[in-house]
C-alpha cells in the first residue's frame, strides 16, 4: 500500500523537518492470523467438500463442537483457488458477471451521486467533486455541518477535470488491484498545467466502503504525476455488489468453510456473531463488527487470548486498543446518527460492547473524542447505552455544529468513578497517527536548542520575519505558540541571571553561544516536556 508522506513546516525548517504518513494504516504490533469464515448448508458441504477430492487433499476438517464442522486449508494451499478450479464456469459466464457488475455499479454511482457535491479537506487544499460538473481543488474552509464553502479564495482554484456533458460518452471501467475490484472513470478537460502545458486530469476510483447507511465520501486525493491525479470515492451501496464488496482484510485473510448446523442445536456463538456482523480487522487481535442490520449497534471483538481477564486491565490492553481505535478512525468506519462520517474535527462520546469470539460480553469501551483532537478510552462493565441512538451518547460536528446530547453516561468522569470506587482507567490516544505527539516532542527539542544559541532579542527578530512571510497557516500557528513558550522561559532565565549577578551588564542584546549553553541548564527535561504538552494544534491548521 502506498503511503503519501507530508512535511509540516516548523519554526526553523533546517533544524526540524517534521513528517508523518497521511492516513497510513497502523501495522499490527503482534502478528495475528486473520480468517474469513463462510457458512454453507448440508448439501453444499457434501458436494463441495466431502465429495471433492481435490479440496479434501488441500486441508482438513475440524469438529468445533455443537454440531459445527469447519474445513481449514493447509498453509501451502489456497482454498479459494481450489474451489474456483472445481467450479466449471465458462469464460462467457465470467464475462457476463463482470459486465453485470459494471453496469449495476455505474447505475449506483449515478443514483447516489446525482446532483450532490462531496468534498475532502487535506491541509491547505480542499477537493470538491460535483459529478457531471467538475472536480476542483481550492483553498478555503468548509462548514462540515452544512457542507457550505466558507472564505473560498478564487485566486487559488484549479479545475482537475470536467466530465463530458453527454452521459453516454462518459467511460467507466471495472478494474482490479491488490485490494479488489473497483470502478474507474477518467475525467479530463482540466485547467492547463503551468509545468507540462497539458490539461489536468483525474482518475476517480469508485469503491465499496463507509457505513451501510452513510453518505458517499472522498477518501483521499493524490497527485501521481505532475498535474495528474487519483481520487478514491467510497459509495456504501456498491458493497451490495459481490465483486466490489470484498475488502483488503478479506483478501488477506485465510478462508475457513463451515457447515451450518441446525439452529436448534446451537446457542449464541461465533456463527450467530459472524452472520450478523461484518468483521473488519483493526490489528492487535481486535475486530470492528459492523452489523448487517442497521438498527443494531457496532461492536468490538477480541480474539487475542492475552486480553481475556477484564477484571485486571493492564497497560497492554490500552496500547492494543489505542492502535485499533486509531485504525478504526482512519478507516472512517464510524457514522454519526445523522449519517455523517466521524472525522477529525468532530467530537463525541461513543460506546461499544467488547465481546469475545462467541459473542460473550466482556466489558464496554467508551471513546471520548475531544475538540483538541485527542481522545480518551475508558473500560467499564457498567456503562449503559441510550437505546434510541445506537453507539452514541453525544456528538458535535466540527467547530460549527451544535452539541447534541443523546443520553447520560454512567460514571462518565473521573470524579464519579473514584467516588463509586469503580475501575475505569483511561488511556490517551491521538487521532492523527501520532502527528500531534511527534510535533510536541520536536517543538520541545527546538525550544531547548534555541534557548542555548539565541538571545531573546534575536528570537524576536526571527519570529517577526516569519510573521511577515509565513509559509502557511500551520507555520504561523506553530510559530506563535512556540514563541509564547520560549518567551515564558526566557523571562524566568533573565530573572535568575539577575539574581546571580547584580553587577552584570544588561545592555547586551546578544550572547555568546558558549555562555548561552552554560546558562540554560535550569531547564530540566520534565519542564521541557510540560511546555511541549501545552502546545496545542487545531485540526484546521493541520
Swiss-Prot record:
Pfam families: PRKCSH, Yos9_DD. Its main location: endoplasmic reticulum. This is Protein OS-9 homolog. It comes from Saccharomyces cerevisiae (strain ATCC 204508 / S288c) (Baker's yeast). Residues 1-21 form the signal peptide. Lectin involved in the quality control of the secretory pathway. As a member of the endoplasmic reticulum-associated degradation lumenal (ERAD-L) surveillance system, targets misfolded endoplasmic reticulum lumenal glycoproteins for degradation. The recognition of targets is N-glycan specific. Functions in recruiting misfolded protein substrates in conjunction with HRD3. The keyword Transcription does not apply. CDD domains: Yos9_DD. It is found in: Endoplasmic reticulum membrane. Belongs to the OS-9 family. It comes from the Eukaryota. Glycans are attached at residues 52, 74, 380. The gene is YOS9.
Amino acid at each position: 500500500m502506498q503511503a503519501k508522506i507530508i512535511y509540516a513546516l516548523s519554526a526553523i525548517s533546517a533544524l526540524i523537518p517534521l513528517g508523518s504518513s497521511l492516513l497510513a494504516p497502523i501495522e499490527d504490533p503482534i502478528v495475528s492470523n486473520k480468517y474469513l469464515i463462510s457458512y454453507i448448508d448440508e448439501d453444499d458441504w457434501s458436494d463441495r467438500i466431502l465429495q471433492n477430492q481435490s479440496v479434501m487433499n488441500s486441508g482438513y476438517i475440524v469438529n468445533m463442537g455443537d454440531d459445527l464442522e469447519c474445513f481449514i486449508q493447509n498453509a501451502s494451499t489456497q482454498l479459494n483457488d481450489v474451489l474456483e478450479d472445481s467450479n466449471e464456469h465458462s469464460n462467457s459466464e465470467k464475462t457476463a458477471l463482470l459486465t453485470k457488475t459494471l453496469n449495476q455499479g455505474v447505475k449506483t454511482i449515478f443514483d447516489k451521486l446525482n446532483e450532490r457535491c462531496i468534498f475532502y479537506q487535506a491541509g491547505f487544499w480542499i477537493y470538491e467533486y460535483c459529478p457531471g460538473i467538475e472536480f476542483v481543488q481550492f483553498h478555503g474552509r468548509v462548514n462540515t455541518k452544512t457542507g457550505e464553502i466558507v472564505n473560498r479564495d478564487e485566486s487559488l482554484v484549479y479545475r482537475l477535470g470536467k466530465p463530458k456533458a453527454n452521459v453516454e460518452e462518459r467511460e467507466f471501467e471495472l478494474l482490479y488491484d491488490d485490494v479488489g475490484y473497483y470502478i474507474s472513470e477518467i475525467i479530463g478537460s482540466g485547467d492547463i498545467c503551468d509545468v507540462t502545458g497539458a490539461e489536468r486530469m483525474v482518475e476517480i476510483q469508485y469503491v465499496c466502503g463507509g457505513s451501510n447507511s452513510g453518505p458517499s465520501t472522498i477518501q483521499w486525493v493524490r497527485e501521481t504525476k505532475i498535474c495528474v491525479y487519483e481520487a478514491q470515492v467510497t459509495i456504501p451501496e456498491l458493497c451490495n455488489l459481490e465483486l466490489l464488496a470484498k475488502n483488503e482484510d478479506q483478501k488477506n485473510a485465510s478462508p475457513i468453510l463451515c457447515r451450518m448446523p441446525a439452529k436448534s442445536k446451537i446457542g449464541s456463538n461465533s456463527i450467530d456473531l459472524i452472520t450478523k456482523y461484518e468483521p473488519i480487522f483493526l490489528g492487535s487481535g481486535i475486530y470492528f463488527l459492523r452489523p448487517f442490520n442497521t438498527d443494531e449497534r457496532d461492536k468490538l471483538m477480541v480474539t487475542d487470548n492475552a486480553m481475556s481477564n477484564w477484571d485486571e486491565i493492564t497497560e497492554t490492553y490500552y496500547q492494543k486498543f489505542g492502535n485499533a481505535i486509531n485504525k478504526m478512525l482512519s478507516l472512517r468506519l464510524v457514522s454519526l446518527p445523522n449519517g455523517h462520517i466521524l472525522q477529525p474535527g468532530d467530537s463525541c462520546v461513543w460506546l461499544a460492547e467488547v465481546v469475545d469470539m462467541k459473542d460473550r460480553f466482556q466489558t464496554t469501551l467508551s471513546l471520548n473524542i475531544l475538540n483538541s483532537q485527542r481522545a480518551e478510552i475508558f473500560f467499564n462493565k457498567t456503562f449503559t447505552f441510550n437505546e434510541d441512538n445506537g453507539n452514541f451518547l453525544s456528538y458535535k460536528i466540527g467547530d460549527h455544529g451544535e452539541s447534541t446530547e443523546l443520553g447520560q453516561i454512567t460514571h462518565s468522569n473521573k470524579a464519579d468513578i473514584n467516588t463509586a470506587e469503580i475501575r475505569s482507567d483511561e488511556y490517551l490516544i491521538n487521532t492523527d497517527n501520532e502527528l500531534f505527539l511527534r510535533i510536541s516532542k520536536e517543538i520541545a527539542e527546538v525550544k531547548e536548542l534555541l534557548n542555548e544559541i539565541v538571545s531573546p532579542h534575536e528570537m524576536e527578530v526571527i519570529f517577526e520575519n516569519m510573521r511577515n512571510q509565513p509559509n502557511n497557516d500551520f507555520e504561523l500557528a506553530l510559530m506563535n505558540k512556540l514563541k509564547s513558550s520560549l518567551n515564558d522561559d526566557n523571562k524566568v532565565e533573565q530573572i535568575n541571571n539577575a539574581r546571580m549577578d547584580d553587577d552584570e551588564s544588561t545592555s547586551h542584546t546578544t550572547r555568546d553561544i558558549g555562555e548561552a549553553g552554560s546558562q540554560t541548564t535550569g531547564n530540566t527535561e520534565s519542564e521541557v516536556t510540560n511546555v511541549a504538552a501545552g502546545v496545542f494544534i487545531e485540526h484546521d491548521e493541520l
